[in-house]
Structure formats: structure tokens, C-alpha cells
Amino acid sequence: MDRKTLDDTSKFLSYVLRHQPEAIGLKLDGEGWADIDALIAGAARDGRALDRALLGAVVENNDKKRFALSADGQRIRAVQGHSHAAVAIAYAPAVPPAVLYHGTASRFLDSIRERGLVPGSRHHVHLSARRATALEVGRRYGSPVLLEIDARDMHLAGHLFHQAENGVWLTERVPVRFIREA
């Protein structure tokens, strides 16, 4: 399968499994799972060719491991990044490493300095244990800035952290006092 097909399909899946399942008449359960046959049928109604082999290839080859298949192979979901109100994945609380990172664009710094990191339309703020990963994320939005999060002190102050299946760290928000520019 060619890279463009995989990337285009990944973007489509991100859209319908994270944000707008109703765009193709798809229903997600509370944990974000969608029936694969319903997804394929909805994609076909939207004029997109999608089959189980392509879905499997996207799940297997996605560099950020954004998607997961159920154990029985009948359902698929986005691992994290949801903005859809019906989805509330029950991530287990986890103890974060001492420092986590967040990549952003320089144009967002004034807002972050004032409000901290907030999830925006998503359910969680996304953090990384790797500087390089966070910088890569920041580059998607413009001139990248790396933020260092004092996750240990934040956790000790009572803020909950979760880790998605793909290794992304999640929290509800990051107050200003735990953020410094790296």
C-alpha cells in the first residue's frame, strides 16, 4: 500500500473517529469504539474506498499508533485525541515521569503564559515523554516552541495523569506554574 493512501486514510479516520463520526453516519460507543462494517459502509456513502485490509495497514503502520483494533477485530477506535462529547475513554491513572514535554507554536505562547495548557476542543492536554516528539508536534502549527512540564510536582499537587495505549500522556490541564520554556 502506498504512503499517500495510508496517510489520507489516517486523516479520514482521525476526523471520523475523534471528532465527527456523524459526518458519515457512524456511531461511537462511550469508549470511542466503532463497528468496522459500519465504518466501511459510511466511508462508501462518503465516496471513500475503505476495506479491512486498508484499515489493518493504517493501524499497523501509523507511526504514532493513533488507532487500535478490538481483540475480536470487529471494532476500531482512535486511541486518544477525541473532541466528541459521547466519548469518554476510561484511562487508568498513571504516575508520570518527572518531566514531560509539550510542543506548540510560538503564536500560542501569550495565551499559554496567561492560561496554562488547556485542551481546547479535545478532552485532554497531550504531553510527550520525548522532547523530539513534542517538537515535531509543535512544527505542525508553525514556528515550534518546546515547553517543559514539571509533571512530578503537578502530580504531587493532585493533578491526574493518564497514558494512552500509544504512549501519549494525558491530563485535563496544565497550570502556568508547572510550565517553563525549554
From Swiss-Prot:
Removes the 2'-phosphate from RNA via an intermediate in which the phosphate is ADP-ribosylated by NAD followed by a presumed transesterification to release the RNA and generate ADP-ribose 1''-2''-cyclic phosphate (APPR>P). May function as an ADP-ribosylase. Transmembrane segments: none annotated. Keywords: NAD, Transferase. The keyword S-adenosyl-L-methionine does not apply. One of its GO terms (biological process) is tRNA splicing, via endonucleolytic cleavage and ligation. It is an enzyme of class 2 (transferase). Belongs to the KptA/TPT1 family. NCBIfam families: PRK00819.1-1, PRK00819.1-4. This is Probable RNA 2'-phosphotransferase. Pfam families: PTS_2-RNA. GO terms for molecular function: NAD+ poly-ADP-ribosyltransferase activity; tRNA 2'-phosphotransferase activity. SUPFAM superfamilies: ADP-ribosylation (SSF56399). Its EC number is 2.7.1.-. It comes from Pseudomonas aeruginosa (strain UCBPP-PA14).
